[in-house]
Amino acid sequence: MWDHLKVTDSEVHDLLIGELKRQEYGLELIASENFASVAVMEAMGSILTNKYAEGYPAKRYYGGCEWVDKIEDLARERAKQLFKVKYANVQPHSGSQANMAAYLSIAEPGDVLMGMSLSHGGHLTHGASVNFSGKLFKVIQYGVNPETEMINYDEVRSMALQYKPKIIVAGGSAYSRIIDFKKFREIADEAGAYLVVDMAHFAGLVAAGLYPNPAEYAHIVTSTTHKTLRGPRGGLILTNDAEIYKAVNKTVFPGTQGGPLMHVIAAKAVCFKEAMSSGFVEYQKQVIANAKTLANELSSMGLRIVSGGTDTHLMLVDLTPLNVTGKAAEKALEKCGVTVNKNTIPNETRSPFVASGIRIGTPAVTTRGMREKEMKKIAELIFEVLKNVLDEEGNIPPHIQANVQMAVKKLCEEFPLYVDKIII
């Protein structure tokens, strides 16, 4: 593998080797990242990247689409089966583009969109002012209860009835608790709004039956196909409404995209098949068990877990008790081979570029085969680094850094990722 690349472009080849080593010998704890199977990557790197296929199966604007039509049909059917829905569009290039298409299929620019505040656990595309969603729509943002740090459904209802949004968005990128979609739908119906659920972060948990299926209540469900779903980087739109499905299709193409990425759609089909296996269900159970163990261990060491714990694959850690910023923590951990991301916390006092917390997720380390025992070790390593941060650049004493680096590498070597699967 990569032999042709090595000959043609040794610079890119060498950079790929560097990234392979980072993934192989580092602890990946970014909640939105995971490791795709070799089968998924083979589909991604296939000859399908050569094929243009504007339009939809049996209704293309290019010839020669016999085989890609079958591939897209297969991906759509598998998505429908996996998430128990009537309709699926597998063409969105990303979760953000899936959200854009979803919004524009049921609303017009200038309409009111209500979503969760980014600093409370939402996502850029849920109405952040710097994002298209905040520029195209009039945005109302809800948050979490300041005491429980969980969604305040009474506040959501009150705001929805007051502002009468066209769209209510549920879902988030840093919210660790199970969301009550039934309650959201009741609020949406009362306010005369469409309910869009962005399940990008927890789609794998939904597929495994370990998280409520939002398709039972939402007018539209959007998702990415990576993260907990463990597929290629891409987007997905689901619905049970025939008219909405027609509008979604028109909004994806030609509304917001041109040709679909057929190599990515093939990889999506592979990942949907993988997600229908019994092994995938066991994997997702372990993802949650690992997250709960890691959160409990960090809490026992004196760190504060936002909302007091997690129901899912991720947790938000408040670093205020250690007087360390998220920025410094991210840098310090990365120096030791542990990757997380700085993250704002509810009622944040710092800028998003500094932040008071870090977001941690367990999908990637669980993919490697790690379990509760390893989570306890990882918690020890994280705490050892965080309690020794010296400055805002994330510097820590050299001997601490060396010891943690060695421990991280040793742990990763016990759970090999790609070295035994990819021939370099």
Swiss-Prot record:
- What catalytic activity is recorded? (6R)-5,10-methylene-5,6,7,8-tetrahydrofolate + glycine + H2O = (6S)-5,6,7,8-tetrahydrofolate + L-serine
Which branch of life, at top level?
Answer: Bacteria
- Is the keyword Zinc in the record? no
Subunit organization: Homodimer.
Could you tell me one molecular function GO term of this UniProt entry? pyridoxal phosphate binding
Query: So what family is this one in?
Result: Belongs to the SHMT family.
Q: What cofactor does this protein call for?
A: pyridoxal 5'-phosphate
Which biological process terms from the Gene Ontology are attached to this UniProt entry? glycine biosynthetic process from serine; tetrahydrofolate interconversion
UniProt source species: Pseudothermotoga lettingae (strain ATCC BAA-301 / DSM 14385 / NBRC 107922 / TMO)
Residues binding (6S)-5,6,7,8-tetrahydrofolate are L118, G122, H123, L124, S351, P352, F353
Question: What name does UniProt use for this protein?
Answer: Serine hydroxymethyltransferase
